[in-house]
Amino acid sequence: MTTTQTAKASRRARIERRTRESDIVIELDLDGTGQVAVDTGVPFYDHMLTALGSHASFDLTVRATGDVEIEAHHTIEDTAIALGTALGQALGDKRGIRRFGDAFIPMDETLAHAAVDLSGRPYCVHTGEPDHLQHTTIAGSSVPYHTVINRHVFESLAANARIALHVRVLYGRDPHHITEAQYKAVARALRQAVEPDPRVSGVPSTKGAL
């Protein structure tokens, strides 16, 4: 596996991640306006990442190819790893940001919540999904999305961005709604956490570093 990283500016990142299973390029601008272009070869995942970038107000470009003819797992997880790496790089030294964010997102019968701390200490808690999501496939294309991957996505994002991320489903029935509400909750929590805080000029930590 090879990974190359190039910082364009303090709030931007470009990540290239290549393995025998996938080839991924991500461009991220935290100070964007929600301009998103995603092509992973997994249509439902494209839909989820588009929602994430749009509702976080990030400018996000994702180009990924992988062994989806075997199964989408590798491409989905590797893309989440690269996205987390890009987020961590774009945050830089985290001076002047709010650091914490949280959001409740309803989607019809579903309610999801996400809370984030851009702490530099990677941790993910993912809870509340109904048991049937362990065995649900969202099809509609030749490359389906298995909802059991949701936890892997959030864990990979948190680990590689080095953030604490808590995602929970309070209630819901429809697998599409449950999945999408979680992605949107994470997006809105991140949007809040990365925002500049006009009252903070340094790193938002009593330790002086994150």
UniProtKB/Swiss-Prot annotation:
Enzyme Commission number, as recorded: 4.2.1.19
Q: Name one GO cellular component term.
A: cytoplasm
Q: How is its activity regulated?
A: Competitive inhibition by 3-amino-1,2,4-triazole (e.g. ATZ).
GO biological process terms held by the UniProt record: L-histidine biosynthetic process
Kindly give the InterPro entries that the UniProt entry links to this protein: IGPD_sf, ImidazoleglycerolP_deHydtase, ImidazoleglycerP_deHydtase_CS, Ribosomal_Su5_D2-typ_SF
Which pathway is it part of?
A: Amino-acid biosynthesis; L-histidine biosynthesis; L-histidine from 5-phospho-alpha-D-ribose 1-diphosphate: step 6/9
Q: What class of enzyme is it?
A: lyase
Cofactor(s) needed, names only, are: Mn(2+)
Q: Which reaction does it catalyse?
A: D-erythro-1-(imidazol-4-yl)glycerol 3-phosphate = 3-(imidazol-4-yl)-2-oxopropyl phosphate + H2O
Cofactor: binding comment = Binds 2 manganese ions per subunit.
Q: Report the subcellular localization.
A: Cytoplasm
Which sites bind Mn(2+) 1?
H47, H74, H176, E180
Which keywords accompany this UniProt record? Amino-acid biosynthesis, Cytoplasm, Histidine biosynthesis, Lyase, Manganese, Metal-binding
Principal place of residence: cytoplasm
Q: Which family does it belong to?
A: Belongs to the imidazoleglycerol-phosphate dehydratase family.
> What PANTHER family does the annotation carry?
IMIDAZOLEGLYCEROL-PHOSPHATE DEHYDRATASE, IMIDAZOLEGLYCEROL-PHOSPHATE DEHYDRATASE HIS7
Protein name per UniProt: Imidazoleglycerol-phosphate dehydratase
* Native species: Mycobacterium tuberculosis (strain ATCC 25618 / H37Rv)
